[in-house]
Amino acid sequence: MINLHNAENEKEAEMQIGTPTDVKHVAHIGWDGGSVNHNPPSWMKDFKVLGGYSPALIGNIKEDASCIFEDSTRSRDIPRLPKSSRERSSTLGGSPTKERSRRRGSSQYNGNPKVSRRSSKESSAIPQDGGFNKKSRRKKSKDCVDGGSRRSSRRVRGSQVESISDSSSTSDAGYLT
């Protein structure tokens, strides 16, 4: 006989799981802190500098970045047109789809451009009382309440043909009496 009482008294070594704040985020791995002289992280010291890369050069590139944006000021010299005149100028050489989308936004759809013709016709067909055509449902017979199979039978007038529908199995094709 095994003594269960002794097995319960023995304690296994408990594992302690640290809190989420004990985990170092991946983005911080290798970061030695913000140094003023832009030294690479300690894990980067093992790699050789290729192609004249140095942190000092990156600082110069950031300072000289203003020369890249000289040409971008030319687009600012062009005066901005109001929205209505921009639409007119775009439709002169624009596509017919833009014209159609602008027409849809007109007042013939109650001022709401999202309403389409189909949905406005369908909304008029819905009865005002909010009722929809609901199909009537048959009540389950007492035989079906407890999860049993449902069988129905009917006789065709003037003949002995009987149709049986069985929802649980097709092998039981006996006649109901």
Curated annotation (Swiss-Prot):
Gene3D superfamilies named in the record: CRIB domain
Coiled coil location: none
Record SMART domains: PBD
CDD domains reported for this sequence: CRIB
Compositionally skewed regions (Low complexity) per UniProt: 158-171
Feature: compositional bias, Basic and acidic residues: 72-89
Family matches, as InterPro entries: CRIB_dom, CRIB_dom_sf
Role noted for this protein: Functions as a downstream effector of Rho-related GTP binding proteins of the 'Rho of Plants' (ROPs) family. Participates in the propagation of ROP GTPase signals in specific cellular responses.
Name assigned to this protein: CRIB domain-containing protein RIC8
Annotated organism of origin: Arabidopsis thaliana
Source organism phylogeny: Eukaryota, Viridiplantae, Streptophyta, Embryophyta, Tracheophyta
